[in-house]
């Protein structure tokens, strides 16, 4: 599974577990819905770690716990994948 696919699925799973929409997740995380929507719809394959941290904070989850999921056991990096830290 590609890393961006695993991250997308994890976000869907978290929103489902919390019983909230992606729009509500963006609001509770303090990030623009357009940012989350663009990533989730595949228009963008990158999400900054800062944005991911805000998503975690919006659900009272530690960043390290986001990656403690079987989805991340066998991920593959995309070609030319960039990691942005802001």
Spans of features found by a protein language model:
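Short, charged recognition helix plus adjacent turn
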Residues: 1, 38, 67-86
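Short alpha-helical DNA-recognition segment
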Residues: 19-38
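Residues within the helices of the helix-turn-helix
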Residues: 12, 23, 53
């Amino acid at each position: 599974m590609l890393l961006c696919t695993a991250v997308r699925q994890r976000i869907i799973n978290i929103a489902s577990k919390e019983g909230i929409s992606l729009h509500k997740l963006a609001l509770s995380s303090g990030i623009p819905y357009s940012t989350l929507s663009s990533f989730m719809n595949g228009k963008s394959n990158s999400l900054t770690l800062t944005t991911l941290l805000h998503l975690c904070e919006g659900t009272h989850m530690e960043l390290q716990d986001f990656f403690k999921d079987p989805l991340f056991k066998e991920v593959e990096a995309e070609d030319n994948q960039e990691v942005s830290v802001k």
